[in-house]
From Swiss-Prot:
PROSITE patterns: D_2_HYDROXYACID_DH_2, D_2_HYDROXYACID_DH_3
Gene Ontology annotations for the cellular component aspect, listed alphabetically: cytosol; plasma membrane
Native source species: Escherichia coli O1:K1 / APEC
Gene3D superfamilies: NAD(P)-binding Rossmann-like Domain
Gene that this polypeptide is encoded by: ghrB
InterPro entries: D-isomer_2-hydroxyacid_DH, D-isomer_2_OHA_DH_cat_dom, D-isomer_DH_CS, D-isomer_DH_NAD-bd, Glyo/OHPyrv_Rdtase_B, NAD(P)-bd_dom_sf
Name of the molecule in the record: Glyoxylate/hydroxypyruvate reductase B
Annotated transmembrane regions: none
Length: 324
């Protein structure tokens, strides 16, 4: 008899078929308490869980006594109670490598669109404001040869550094938990403390996961240390930034502009002050959102769940020690 798994995110037909070759698959719309209650028998028997964008906490795990592995279609896993999973010896799988290049593309797009005011001036053209040769009020700022500060030199940080160094001749500063020898050798990146990075960078790109240590890492104190001409980019996790402090910094002119792919609350409220600022490019968490990459992430998540329930945790496992 095949193990039972719960799928709470739609998959392409071929990937669903692959999953069904190994498991009895039960599809649900979400992991809300109502859904769990309505499908209590299914949740009670499930050994695997696959999906994204839903909280997996201790309360849910109580309803799933046979759960052995969870697989998220994402690199981030801050919506999972890792301690509760680990205490139950439940494996948590994620997709850390598939989306690296695509997210780095998004970061570079935010750098370019904020610096050159692409969204703002495109909207002005559509509004009929281009009636003569443009003047300084339409101008942006250069990207090439400007200093890029990267906070978080992981896979995505490295991919961004590659684009910035070879494509735009940008000097690179970085701050991370440890020195990154490859970044220093390949891109001439310079490690520095966070204060120095903030003070010297023309673009500050934040690429950090959300943890207890990184929550509101960026607040009023950090924005006050940045150049008034600097542009802030966040494509990591929204709550790493105190959004009210960011809004205040933009309103006071402490920083020049911001390109944001993530927010403290998602979707972003329609009455957020960020949406009324011409110098803010706000996009709806599109970091990995291409057809190719989202398919690749889903395929990876399917393979991860198959591997996990077969006891294979050599890659893409957040807590592999629970399999010992």
């Amino acid at each position: 008899m095949k193990p039972s798994v719960i799928l709470y995110k739609a998959l392409p037909d071929d990937l669903l078929q692959r999953l069904q070759e190994h498991f009895t698959v039960h599809q649900v719309a979400n992991l809300s308490p109502q859904t769990v209650e309505q499908n209590a028998a299914i949740f009670a028997e499930a050994e695997g869980l696959l999906g994204s964008n839903e909280n997996v906490d201790a309360a849910l795990l109580e309803k799933m006594p046979k759960l052995r592995a969870t697989s998220t279609i994402s690199v981030g896993y801050d919506n999972f109670d890792v301690d509760a999973l680990t205490a139950r010896k439940i494996l948590l799988m994620h997709t850390p490598t598939v989306l690296t290049e695509t997210v780095a593309d998004t970061l570079m797009a935010l750098v370019l669109s904020t610096a050159r005011r692409v969204v703002e001036v495109a909207e002005r053209v559509k509004a009929g404001e281009w009636t003569a040769s443009i003047g300084p009020d339409w101008y942006g700022t250069d990207v090439h040869h400007k200093t890029l500060g990267i906070v978080g030199m992981g896979r995505i940080g490295m991919a961004l550094a590659q684009r910035a160094h070879f494509g735009f001749n940008m000097p690179i500063l970085y701050n991370a938990r440890r020195h990154h020898k490859e970044a220093e050798e390949r891109f001439n990146a310079r490690y520095c403390d966070l204060d120095t990075l903030l003070q010297e960078s023309d673009f500050v790109c934040l690429i950090l996961p959300l943890t207890d240590e990184t929550h509101h890492l960026f607040g009023a104190e950090q924005f006050a240390k940045m150049k008034s001409s600097a542009i802030f980019i966040n494509a990591g996790r929204g709550p790493v930034v105190d959004e009210n402090a960011l809004i205040a910094a933009l309103q006071k002119g402490e920083i020049h502009a911001a390109g944001l792919d993530v927010f403290e609350q998602e979707p972003l409220s329609v009455d957020s002050p960020l949406l009324s600022m011409a110098n803010v490019v706000a996009v709806p968490h599109i970091g990995s959102a291409t057809h190719e990459t989202r398919y690749g992430m889903a395929a990876c998540a399917v393979d991860n769940l198959i591997d996990a329930l077969q006891g294979k945790v050599e890659k893409n496992c957040v807590n592999p020690h629970v399999a010992d």
